[in-house]
A protein has these predicted regions:
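Glycine-rich hexapeptide-repeat left-handed beta-helix
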Residues: 1-6, 40-48, 54-56, 61-68, ...
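Extended, small-residue-rich solenoid/repeat segments and analogous flexible loops
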Residues: 1-36, 154-161
Length: 161
């Protein structure tokens, strides 16, 4: 695959982050230290205001792109593989979300959770465990947005130097 990387002017990509393949990074999004985004066979779209934190791994499979919605926080060491993440989602430290999984808007995926292939997480879910399970529902959009806004400010500050 020919590399087709698109980074919005207002986005921040740390110099140690690795982007390869067909990747788009939207306005106000950020990709932090040592994150790896590989898309040899399908597109990776990182939405407006989303943050991909340190050491995150994002990868695709044939026919399984990755979409990260607007104002999401994908936290340290998380892995996204061929999945769809709705808007205003927080994915906890070291969580893994696998091929064909769909995480509904406003959800929180707890640290170390393993969301298996093709699992569908309803909007506003709180999810923990390996294998992952929904333990309750709550509207987390505002809290998740506040976290994302923090990273928007950080990204802008890093861009300014």
């Amino acid at each position: 695959m020919t590399s087709r990387i698109t980074i919005a002017d207002s986005a921040f990509v740390h110099p140690s982050a690795q982007l390869y393949g067909h990747v788009s990074v939207a306005d106000d999004a950020s990709v932090w230290c040592n994150a790896v985004v590989r898309s040899e066979v399908a597109h990776v779209a990182i939405g407006r205001g989303a943050n991909i934190q340190d050491f995150v791994m994002i990868h695709t499979d044939p026919g399984k792109p990755v979409t990260v919605g607007a104002y999401c926080s994908i936290t340290h060491h998380a892995t996204l593989h061929g999945c769809t993440i709705g808007d205003h989602v927080l994915v906890g430290v070291n969580a893994t979300i696998f091929n064909g999984a769909v995480v509904g808007a406003g959800s929180i995926i707890g640290q170390h959770a393993y969301v298996r292939d093709f699992m569908e997480i309803p909007p506003n879910s709180i999810v923990v465990g390996s294998p992952a399970k929904v333990i309750r529902t709550a509207d987390n959009r505002l809290a998740n947005r506040v976290n994302a806004e923090f990273y928007i400010r950080n990204g802008a500050a890093y861009k300014r130097g």
